[in-house]
């Protein structure tokens, strides 16, 4: 730990007007930063979350939006301030140093399922703005409007979570890969804590019932979990469990789901609705058949 950082922090604490702080020790600061880094290391999905938060913060700053205090995840972490996720220096905002020395992560994981979790983050960031409105115009594309004084501001923000998967895999520590068999086994039991693209209760239930045997199965579940296709799950589950499907559309158990299947002229005879392709399908397409559980 850099002593210069400690001096900077203690100097800032000493300048606060409304609260008296005792000096922070190098051990206390090191412990907090270690805790946050350990939290990131515990699940690769959390590192992806930080990347997405950085992108979101950059978009907000470019639209003259100030990330203000009031929510635990964004403002009260000195580590997130140092890495640029938030521009709010928690010391200058006179937030108690006790927040630096205890975990603030319980319940703070934001599910970015199909991009909709960005909606919640945007609302947190825009706290205190007048006439704030955030809508998702299409999967992963958000239109944010708010009043800045008397001026109506508008910003469009695109964060397609699944499209970030390849970049996320390049940033995680060596030895873990989204296609490894241990991860597939965990997912087959619905153990998806910290896996931000499979966090909902319904998806956990699906994973438990479906018992995915390959990355292809995981991609299929992601693609099904969307309005217009979610009702296909019971039939696909039945076909997987019974083996009642032919060679056509084998990856999706005989029912067309993916975008490229829409180009098949025989699809008109099937009577199945195909919605917009999930980003997961596009991002994971090269890997879909490479990993099978033994």
Where are these regions (language model features)?
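Mg2+-dependent phosphoryl-transfer active-site scaffold
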Residues: 1-17, 37-38, 55-60, 67-70, ...
């Amino acid at each position: 730990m850099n002593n210069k950082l400690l001096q900077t922090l203690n100097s800032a604490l000493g300048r606060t007007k409304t609260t008296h702080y005792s000096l922070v020790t190098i051990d206390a600061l090191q412990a907090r930063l270690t805790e946050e880094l350990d939290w990131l290391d515990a699940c690769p999905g959390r590192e992806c979350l930080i990347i997405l938060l950085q992108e979101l913060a950059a978009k907000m700053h470019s639209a003259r939006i100030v990330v203000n205090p009031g929510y635990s995840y964004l403002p009260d972490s000195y580590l997130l301030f140092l890495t640029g996720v938030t521009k709010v220096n928690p010391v200058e905002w006179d937030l108690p140093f006790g927040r630096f020395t205890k975990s603030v992560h319980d319940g703070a994981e934001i599910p970015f399922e199909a991009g909709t979790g960005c909606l919640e983050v945007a609302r947190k960031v825009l706290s205190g703005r007048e006439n704030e409105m955030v809508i998702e115009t299409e999967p992963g594309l958000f239109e944010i409007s708010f009043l800045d004084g008397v001026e109506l501001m508008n910003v469009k923000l695109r964060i397609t979570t699944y499209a970030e998967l390849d970049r996320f895999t390049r940033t995680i520590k060596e030895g873990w890969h989204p296609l490894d068999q241990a991860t597939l086994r965990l997912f087959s039991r619905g153990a998806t804590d910290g896996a931000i693209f499979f966090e909902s209760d319904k998806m956990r239930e699906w994973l438990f019932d479906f018992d995915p045997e390959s990355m292809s199965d995981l991609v299929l579940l992601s693609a099904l979990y969307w309005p217009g296709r979610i009702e296909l799950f019971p039939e696909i589950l039945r076909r997987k469990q019974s083996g009642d499907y032919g060679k056509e559309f084998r990856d999706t158990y005989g029912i067309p789901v993916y975008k490229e299947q829409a180009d098949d002229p025989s699809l008109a005879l099937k009577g199945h609705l195909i919605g917009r392709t999930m980003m997961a399908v596009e991002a994971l397409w090269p890997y879909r058949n490479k990993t099978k559980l033994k």
